């Protein structure tokens, strides 16, 4: 019975405490100035709503008199608006008012903690404090000394009782573009006024954290299901985080997490807010998208780029196409694509290399085409070095419903990506704390970042509103990509990056050669994923799993390895080179100068392709060899790798012989019955023949000891095979 009474008493006390807290929080009002509803303002409201703050916005719809918005220099307009708003609260003794900027502010905790810390300050008004004095450094000597903490007043955030705040602003008679910070500073530095109003500064950042001058002090603190900003210098957890001065990008970074927008336990909690679903919408009703394609330098795998563009799961009749091709090298490819598929799009505009339009001007033209067309709902800018392998990419980006958003793209096996998580002091790359985790997928979400490039989606409405007067791709002497980001940031438009899906990757252009007929063949080192997609047979993985390997003769294995394109390009490359051997025993290309079993051929090293061919053997042939010949391991070394040409009137067949190899690879590069008749390979010891080689399939067999074989006569047409004597 006694225990029950104790429990009842405890419950009553807790209930009473909760009611007192609720009553206390009812006496808190947050005032802020926002002349327009920017993305920063919406972020501020979202963090306030998370903690159930009561918000009143002042000045919505007014013109802002000072350049740079309410967080910029000037600020007298904020004092005027506050003075007017406080008139109806001047006699409310118990009302606590928090006045903060909004575009660059987030809340990290709720009213209860805020009020507790305010009461502990034992002042009627508490201003945020800063490391740096602004705007008049001559006033530094007048500031009271502080043994520990920030010394100088910051006007971006302060809290106080309504009557005291009314007294604070009562003397304001300034202009809208006068400095609010200087006004408050002079009041604070007047000992009589400071004491009369009872003003103090939040020296140790218990309530307010101004980031300017304090970036090295502030880190994210991940608690269970909650995220705070921690000040390491004073070991405090501020309630209000303010990206004052040049630190707006840092509050963008912190705002990706605080207060609980991303945690290790929950992941992203806001990624599904405000989505624009495209499910159930017919093709004709889908938003119209202008796709801007930019080919600004020689780029590998352009054929794959266009194929992926065609395979986007979005109706071409709702897409318009703008292509800027700076490169004469790609002129025929672009024109061929448009000749075959241009009619599938709603409209097409091509600016070719003959126009000599600069990169930035072309990008401005693409954005303008959407900006000036009211029916253009989205502008999708894609550089040719983007491998967009997710067919739903465009839909996924549209559904995320952001003004500007980019999908994460990285280079194969590297941390290089199409975004920066932070900027250095001079506006160039700096690595944010979360950069590697985002790139490697350990943190997944939608991230507010300062720089994106290569591929992004912009709402047409943003181009016609916030970005309507902007020359987007020129800014000082910056490159077009950095100019674009600087201009977008300056207009207070957020740029988001999503890594919620695997959208694709970036090509490496560093070592791209343009001296061959088919330059993509040489990209096996720089861009292995795309090389595999273009050149390795789609059923190779089945062969590797043992599901598609045939044995036409004893210890002879037959499996798919090359695509049609790989076969065709290798043949065309050899014919383009054209220096076929004579097919006699004298051969200066090999050691000793004598060939016992001569063929009419071209060696891989003659076209400087031996490194790439060895890489192909190591990556794709060696794993199969080790599966098919258990216990044998190879590094796929070779002295001879070549393409052989058989013609009835040239060299139709090959005499019986052993190969100078441990094992041999023989890949058919064209098709029997279409390109030639006859041909094939006969293994004499087993009296077994392969008479109908399949294009793109490889025969693999032992070389110098057991598999004595001959090349059967080609009776019509021209037959090509790629041969490698492996581990001689």
Curated annotation (Swiss-Prot):
Keywords: Dioxygenase, Endoplasmic reticulum, Glycoprotein, Iron, Membrane, Metal-binding, Oxidoreductase, Signal, Vitamin C. It comes from Rattus norvegicus. It is found in: Rough endoplasmic reticulum membrane. Glycans are attached at residues 177, 198, 539, 687. Coiled coil: none annotated. Its EC number is 1.14.11.4. GO terms for biological process: cellular response to hormone stimulus; collagen fibril organization; epidermis development; peptidyl-lysine hydroxylation; response to hypoxia. This is Procollagen-lysine,2-oxoglutarate 5-dioxygenase 1. It catalyses: L-lysyl-[collagen] + 2-oxoglutarate + O2 = (5R)-5-hydroxy-L-lysyl-[collagen] + succinate + CO2. Part of a complex composed of PLOD1, P3H3 and P3H4 that catalyzes hydroxylation of lysine residues in collagen alpha chains and is required for normal assembly and cross-linkling of collagen fibrils. Forms hydroxylysine residues in -Xaa-Lys-Gly- sequences in collagens. These hydroxylysines serve as sites of attachment for carbohydrate units and are essential for the stability of the intermolecular collagen cross-links. It comes from the Eukaryota. Homodimer. Identified in a complex with P3H3 and P3H4. InterPro entries: Collagen_mod_GT25, IPNS-like_FE2OG_OXY, Nucleotide-diphossugar_trans, Oxoglu/Fe-dep_dioxygenase_dom, Pro_4_hyd_alph, Procol_lys_dOase. CDD domains: GT_LH1. Residues 1-18 form the signal peptide. Residues 637-728 form the Fe2OG dioxygenase domain. It is a peripheral membrane protein. The keyword Iron applies. The active site is at residue 719.
